[in-house]
Amino acid sequence: MYSIYHFFNSLVSKKASFGQVKKLVKFPFDNDLLSCRNDGQFPDMAIRVNKKKEIFTGGELIELKDSDSYVVSSFNSTIPTRKKDISKVITSDSSIIKQQMEKAGNGIYSLPFRDVFYLARGRKKGHTKVCLVNGSFFETISVDNLINKSFSQVLDERLKESGAEISGSVKDILSSIFSEQENFSKVRNVEKASVKLRFRIMTEVKAEGNILNSKKYPEIGDDTLNFVLPCDTEEDEKNIISKAKLVFGENTFNEFKIFKIKHHFNGYFLVFQLPLFD
């Protein structure tokens, strides 16, 4: 059985290593849980997909975020999201991710939409915080809407600077056209140009979306390991607790400090917390 819960449980058993490894990628992850593993390419890791998906589907995608401060490191060429279409991750038959998943015996397209998690480590003044956090903590509006509104700001600024005017309907059309992340990631080949141009999106977290920020989220203390899941209803909480008990076992489950935090933009999240060092 595979899932993000099983992955977090494997982190718990080796939690002291978070304070020892210089680079997060060097953490001794349990490769038996993984269908792929890469360095510097999204996803850094993926959980194996279960054949029987009644309780756990598996298949979660994980990106590592390592920082020498209590700020989640920037997202290069990606925008953090709660779910990802696997067909947009695997873009060709020669994809190393596809090859690794097939070698692992995974039915890649049996689970077309994958939950996304971020394993964030921050270090500051000899202390460490580690959070395995669902992507909804960062995706408080849709990716398309984020790009759309950002492009609209650029358009408004240029119109104001140039003194030009366009109708509201034309502006809306232009903004909607430039709302797909894939449009920016393609290499553009211009005739007679000696270079090719590719726009790269870089995403940085605001203080309100920075789970490592001690002022915004004081509950996430120094030297703690945290599992952070969206929890908007009592039913969500019951479901999360049920899965956690099933995977962690009674003894480990009872060691957790369990509480909710209120996201500044996006509802409540349930946190399972342990001290990093015994």
Predicted regions and their residues:
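A short acidic (Asp/Glu
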Residues: Y2-F7, S73-S74, K129-C131
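Sterically constrained small-residue positions within well-ordered secondary structures
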Residues: C36-N38, K53, Y109
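Short linear interaction motifs
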Residues: L24-F29, C36-D44, S92-A104
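Non-catalytic C-terminal interaction segments of nucleic acid-processing enzymes
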Residues: K125-D278
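Catalytic cores of nucleic-acid endonucleases
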Residues: I55-E60, K65-K129
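Alpha-helix termini
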Residues: V12-V21, V49-I55, N106
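Short acidic loop-to-beta-strand element that houses the catalytic metal-binding Asp/Glu
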Residues: D39-K52, G59
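Acidic-basic catalytic patches of nuclease active cores, encompassing PD-(D/E)XK
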Residues: M1-N38, T81
